[in-house]
């Protein structure tokens, strides 16, 4: 098995951050699993939403780094929900249970789409203060599978896994990306048939984001410019949808940059959250803020962030 699963960082994470399970629906089979780390005094934390293949722990490198810098971070794993409205209603109940009025959301792929749908769903009584959308999309029709969305629940687990694995990089990749793919395959193997079927249904069910409902929310679009499951057209559509978004470009990183390019991803997350420091929506403990340090780090990595 890949290096990530046996790495000291991952083992430290699993040994120190407890996995919590929370039920907020009448149906007690719908269980949210989450890691909640960092200062509980922070009332507007950053919440990570995983892709189809991911579990909450795929963001362990963000949790370790960001909590070390004073941020409160929550990484989630979804219950089995079969449509976007059901997901949004369940997520709202979860935030109520956690007593969080507003949050920042980082969504990867499907997680990014669900983050946008939740912001849209709560636009009259906003719960989302900002969005970071990583390798994400705004319209499920890009996958050309809306016609099969209603039949995923019938398919056996091995077939569903094959569909998901079809989007993983198959060409040559560097060792860190190979390790990330191995880890994600392992995480995929841990998901049951209903979990996978429901996520693929959410990923492909005919739906799109209505931008006018969420146009006032600060957005960072994080894209990778090597092999990823997203087409150039899908990326361009996101830029059009959010013309004022900050753009965080990673030259490489594939589908899972939060695992194999974590230093860059973590830095972009810090840069995004910096705009809220000193407000009641800061995701960081005020005593830990050091903008100068962040600027030095930004310069040393030589990352070019384009704002448009």
Curated annotation (Swiss-Prot):
Lineage top rank: taxon: Eukaryota
Keyword Mitochondrion: no
Subunit structure, as described in the record: Interacts with CD4. Interacts with ALDH16A1.
Sequence ranges assigned to domain AB hydrolase-1 in this UniProt record: 87-159
Encoding gene (name): SPG21
Location relative to the cell: Cytoplasm
One GO cellular component term: trans-Golgi network transport vesicle
Pfam family, one: Abhydrolase_1
Molecular functions (GO terms): CD4 receptor binding
Entry keyword set: Cytoplasm
InterPro entries: AB_hydrolase_1 (IPR000073), AB_hydrolase_fold (IPR029058), Maspardin (IPR026151)
Matches recorded under Gene3D superfamilies: alpha/beta hydrolase (3.40.50.1820)
Stated role: May play a role as a negative regulatory factor in CD4-dependent T-cell activation.
Protein name per its UniProtKB record: Maspardin
């Amino acid at each position: 098995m890949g290096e990530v699963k046996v790495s000291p960082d991952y083992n430290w994470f699993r040994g120190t951050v407890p996995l919590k399970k929370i039920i907020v629906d009448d149906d007690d089979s719908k269980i949210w699993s989450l890691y909640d780390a960092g200062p509980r005094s922070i009332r507007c934390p950053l919440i990570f939403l995983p892709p189809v293949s991911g579990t909450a722990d795929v963001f362990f490198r963000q949790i370790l780094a960001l909590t070390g810098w004073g941020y409160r971070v929550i990484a989630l794993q979804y219950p089995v929900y079969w449509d976007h409205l059901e997901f949004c209603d369940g997520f709202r109940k979860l935030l109520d249970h956690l007593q969080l009025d507003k949050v920042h959301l980082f969504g990867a792929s499907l997680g990014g789409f669900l983050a946008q749908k939740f912001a849209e769903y709560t636009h009259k009584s906003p719960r989302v203060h900002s969005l970071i959308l990583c390798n994400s999309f705004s319209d499920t029709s890009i996958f050309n599978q809306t016609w099969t969305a209603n039949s995923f629940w019938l398919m056996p687990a091995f077939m569903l896994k094959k569909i998901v694995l079809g989007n993983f990089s198959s060409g040559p990749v560097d060792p860190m990306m190979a390790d990330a793919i191995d880890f994600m395959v392992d995480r995929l193997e841990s998901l049951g048939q209903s979990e996978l079927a429901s996520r693929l249904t959410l990923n492909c069910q005919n739906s799109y984001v209505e931008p006018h409902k969420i146009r006032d929310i600060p957005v960072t679009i994080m894209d990778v410019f090597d092999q990823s499951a997203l087409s150039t057209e899908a990326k361009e559509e996101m830029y059009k949808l959010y013309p004022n978004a900050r753009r965080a470009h990673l030259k490489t990183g594939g589908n899972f940059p939060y695992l194999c390019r974590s230093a860059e991803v973590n830095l972009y997350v810090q840069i995004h959250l910096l705009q809220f420091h000193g407000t009641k929506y800061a995701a960081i403990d005020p005593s830990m803020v050091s903008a100068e340090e962040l600027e030095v780090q930004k310069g040393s990595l030589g990352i070019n962030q384009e704002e448009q």
